[in-house]
Curated annotation (Swiss-Prot):
Start and end residues of each stretch annotated as Disordered: 1-23, 260-291
Subcellular localization, as worded in the UniProt entry: Cell projection, Cilium, Flagellum; Cytoplasm; Membrane
Name of the protein this chain belongs to: START domain-containing protein 10
Database matches in PROSITE patterns: START
Expression sites by tissue: Testis, kidney, liver, and intestine with the highest level in the testis.
Ranges for domain START: 14-224
An example Gene Ontology CC term for this record: intercellular canaliculus
Any GO BP: lipid transport
Length: 291
């Protein structure tokens, strides 16, 4: 089996905001991401309840750029199960009720690929989509998955969706025992457009905690689901299983936010059904789709 490894290019960490060319993250990039996930200085705690905590970057509260960090303690979920759930694109379609469409496009290396993801936003905002370069790396008993936006010539922005930009988004999964772990989600995203304050507040106070809890429920049900759906197919662990075509990095370019259309939704008010249900998108907490 080919061993997934980070790029060994002899260069320093590339700041997410200053990235000018498409490159597969190296070991230093993974270490930098881990350090930011574990950092406390400069973050404001906005939510802490039932093992889930949410922070926002203090200096970004009133700007277009949104930076959020969520952490959840997962009892009865091994780190490797959570890692599988985040990778398994077919299972994500079952548990992620906000997803509109998601698919892998091409393989770059044994631990990097390019993919598409579109999702429902709280009504009446326009829905978003993104093309990202995703990379992953096991680090002992821990795991990191992270991504940033790229441009692919065959997948330009669509008229019915707003193309968002992931400056850097990812997960740090830390094992705390044979059947427990802690996951930290860190996102630095430009959703493209001037969003109303209620969206920013709702994301940190409700949508992010709800998404983490839904992920936890999905992890509990994953082993049973996977036994019925290609139990041995895990290309993120066994790259030789990947059916994806190979793609050269030269085919991609960095997706800069300033090159995309800016949508002003700052005056949009929350819909009546969103206020009543408190939902992000149209999904519910019904877990019947996970069977």
């Amino acid at each position: 089996m080919e061993k997934p490894a980070a790029s060994t290019e002899p260069q320093g960490s590339r700041p997410a905001l200053g990235r000018e060319s498409v490159q597969v993250p190296d070991d230093q990039d993974f270490r930098s991401f881990r350090s930011e996930c574990e950092a406390e200085v400069g973050w404001n705690l906005t939510y802490s309840k039932a093992g889930v905590s949410v922070w926002v970057q203090a200096v970004e509260m009133d700007r277009t750029l949104h930076k959020i960090k969520c952490r959840m303690e997962c009892c009865d979920v091994p780190a490797e199960t959570l890692y599988d759930v985040l990778h398994d694109i077919e299972y994500r379609k079952k548990w992620d009720s906000n997803v509109i469409e998601t698919f892998d496009i091409a393989r770059l290396t044994v631990n990097a690929d390019v993919g598409y993801y579109s999702w429902r936003c709280p009504k009446p905002l326009k829905n978003r989509d993104v093309i990202t370069l995703r990379s992953w790396l096991p680090m002992g008993a821990d795991y990191i998955i992270m991504n940033y936006s790229v441009k692919h010539p065959k997948y330009p922005p669509r008229k019915d969706l707003v193309r968002a930009v992931s400056i850097q988004t990812g997960y740090l999964i830390q094992s705390t025992g044979p059947k427990s772990c802690v996951i930290t989600y860190l996102a630095q995203v430009d959703p493209k457009g001037s969003l109303p304050k209620w969206v920013v507040n709702k994301s940190s106070q409700f949508l992010a905690p709800k998404a983490m809890k839904k992920m936890y429920k999905a992890c509990i049900k994953y082993p049973e689901w996977k036994q019925k759906h290609q139990p041995h197919f895990k290309p993120w662990l066994h790259p030789e299983q990947s059916p994806l075509p190979s793609l050269a990095l030269s085919e991609l370019s960095v997706q800069h936010a300033d090159s995309l259309e800016n949508i002003d939704e700052s005056a949009v008010t929350e819909s009546r059904e969103e206020r009543a249900g408190g939902a992000g998108g149209e999904g519910s907490d019904d877990d019947t789709s996970l069977t």
